[in-house]
Amino acid sequence: MSLIHPTAIVDPKAQLDSSVEVGPYTVIGPDVVIGAGSKIGPHVVVEGHTTIGADNKIFQFASIGAAPQDKKYAGEPTLLTIGDRNTIREFVTINLGTSQDVGITRLGNDNWIMAYVHIAHDCQLGSNIILANNATLAGHVHLEDWVFLGGFTSVHQFCRIGAHAMTAFTAAVSQDIPPFVTAAGNRAVPAGINSEGLKRRGFSSEQIMAIKRGYKTIYRSGLPLEEAKLALQAEEEKSPDAAQYLRQLREFIEASPRGIIR
């Protein structure tokens, strides 16, 4: 029995694994590749040069691989790549990349993308990310693994959000959020570390306390940022069990192109 509903329109050039399910009235374009076990719900549009991995679930009315919402885009053959085991809920929009950046929008594996989320051109998302309803990523945003964005969070173009960071409902992010940090407000400001998330992911109490000390060094010590980075480096030597996480925090800050939230 065919797993493609008879009302679906699948271009003959599209490459779908034989186990892919396609729901009623879904449209799939000629340059689309979809891996084994993926389920595409009803009324979904998948277009552009889009590659979707295995065991993804895409719900009704999602728009995947449409042209970037960028006036400079002139039809270049840019890409969208989605990994494995992602859940993409109703009315999500994910756009292709642009030639002004690397030309590709990427999602990793095991991400949970809730309804009405927008992921703009050239965004780079890692794995195990949760984007709550109506979260909006402008172009060129980078999210590292295990990021959680609260509902209606908006992220300015080119911002980067570090691993295990979290935002509160309606946060408006205009600068980079370091790893492990919780941000809240419009505009978003630091509001502690994501302690509960770290506990759930197996961080020890000693590691969490060391990360908290690192947070206080950056945000509560009163040190200028350059001096705070040196203090973080010294803290790495005092906390061998958490040194890799403190180093991750420091290196993120050093590499931040927009500067971190303050």
UniProtKB/Swiss-Prot annotation:
Superkingdom: Bacteria
Where it mainly occurs, coarsely classed, is cytoplasm
Instruction: List the EC numbers from the record.
Output: 2.3.1.129
Reactions catalysed, semicolon-separated, are: a (3R)-hydroxyacyl-[ACP] + UDP-N-acetyl-alpha-D-glucosamine = a UDP-3-O-[(3R)-3-hydroxyacyl]-N-acetyl-alpha-D-glucosamine + holo-[ACP]
| Localization in the cell | Cytoplasm
A family per Pfam: Hexapep
Record keywords? Acyltransferase, Cytoplasm, Lipid A biosynthesis, Lipid biosynthesis, Lipid metabolism, Repeat, Transferase
Record-linked InterPro entries: Acetyltransf_C (IPR029098), Acetyltransf_C_sf (IPR037157), Hexapep (IPR001451), Lipid_A_LpxA (IPR010137), Trimer_LpxA-like_sf (IPR011004)
Instruction: Tell me the Gene3D superfamilies matching this sequence.
Output: Hexapeptide repeat proteins, Udp N-acetylglucosamine O-acyltransferase, C-terminal domain
* EC category name: transferase
GO MF, one annotated term: acyl-[acyl-carrier-protein]-UDP-N-acetylglucosamine O-acyltransferase activity
Question: Carries keyword Chaperone?
Answer: no
**Function description:** Involved in the biosynthesis of lipid A, a phosphorylated glycolipid that anchors the lipopolysaccharide to the outer membrane of the cell.
* Membership in a protein family: Belongs to the transferase hexapeptide repeat family. LpxA subfamily.
The protein's name is Acyl-[acyl-carrier-protein]--UDP-N-acetylglucosamine O-acyltransferase
In its UniProt entry, the species of origin is given as: Janthinobacterium sp. (strain Marseille)
Give the gene that encodes this protein: lpxA
